[in-house]
């Protein structure tokens, strides 16, 4: 833009122009963002020596089970995964560094051939899980007919569960992530739960026990939203 000859675009738009503008934004702007993000990450690596990619993986090559998340929780997940792998558990960690546009192809390559993935969500809206599920659905479609260019086709999809944590600053302990892994490999594999929460107490009061039993009967899904936790 020439500051000596400023102009205004998009100030007044009728319906056809507005809709066309939205489509143009997706095709001519958003689709190019990943290239610039990768370029910026490469420049950052050159300057600092710290390497970043839109999707980073640890121990995923031979893993059957995946813990996937964003942000610092993946550092905790790596520490727990290291301990589990020392016990012979084939678990890996996928860390998403770019949320939008979501790097679907990279995520699919990381999840290809896995039995299950647990998405670590620090949000009750489960936005990250929805993006992972969308990528998996598109990869499944591409196995039959390529409708989504660039996304590898998968004939079998891993089961997906959501582990919500940290709401309101709720503490996250290693034992909570171990519980998430144990749930993932279990036959039940609860699809959604809250790490570290306990919705019913071990009360010695007959009145409290009776009330809790009524609540469990009225809201049975609440029982499954809390996992049994061991020691750290």
Please identify what each model-predicted range represents.
Residues 1-57:
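Conformationally flexible catalytic loops at phosphate/diphosphate-handling active centers
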Residues 74-78, 103, 128:
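Short glycine/serine/threonine-rich phosphate/pyrophosphate-binding segments
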Residues 96-104:
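Short acidic loop-to-helix transition motifs that present clustered carboxylates
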Residues 79-89, 106-108, 112, 120, ...:
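Catalytic phosphate/nucleotide-handling subdomain of diverse soluble enzymes
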Residues 35-97, 202-232:
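Non-catalytic terminal/interface segments that mediate subunit docking, oligomerization
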Residues 121-231:
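Peripheral docking tails and interdomain loops at the edges
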Residues 57-61, 109-111, 152-154:
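Solvent-exposed alpha-helices and their adjacent loops that cap or buttress functional pockets
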Residues 1-6, 10, 111-136:
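Terminal amphipathic helices with adjacent charged low-complexity linkers/tails
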């Amino acid at each position: 833009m020439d500051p000596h000859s400023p102009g205004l675009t998009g100030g007044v738009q009728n319906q056809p122009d507005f809709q066309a503008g939205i489509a143009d934004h997706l095709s001519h702007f958003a689709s190019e963002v990943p290239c610039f993000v990768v370029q910026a990450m490469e420049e950052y690596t050159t300057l600092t020596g710290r390497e970043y990619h839109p999707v980073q993986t640890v121990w995923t090559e031979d893993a059957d089970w995946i813990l996937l998340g964003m942000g610092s929780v993946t550092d905790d997940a790596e520490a727990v995964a290291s301990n589990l792998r020392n016990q012979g558990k084939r678990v890996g960690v996928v860390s998403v560094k770019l949320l939008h546009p979501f790097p679907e192809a990279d995520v699919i390559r990381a999840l290809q051939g896995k039995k299950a993935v647990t998405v670590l969500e620090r949000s009750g809206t489960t936005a990250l899980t929805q993006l992972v599920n969308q990528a998996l659905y598109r990869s499944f479609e591409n196995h039959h007919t390529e409708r989504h260019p660039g996304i590898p086709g998968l004939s079998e999809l891993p089961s997906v569960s959501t582990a919500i944590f940290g709401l309101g600053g709720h503490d996250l302990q290693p034992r909570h992530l171990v519980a998430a892994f144990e749930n993932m490999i279990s036959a039940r594999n609860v699809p959604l739960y809250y790490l570290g929460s306990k919705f019913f107490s071990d009360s010695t009061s007959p009145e409290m026990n009776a009330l809790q039993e009524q609540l469990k009967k009225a809201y049975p899904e609440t029982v499954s939203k809390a996992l049994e936790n061991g020691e750290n």
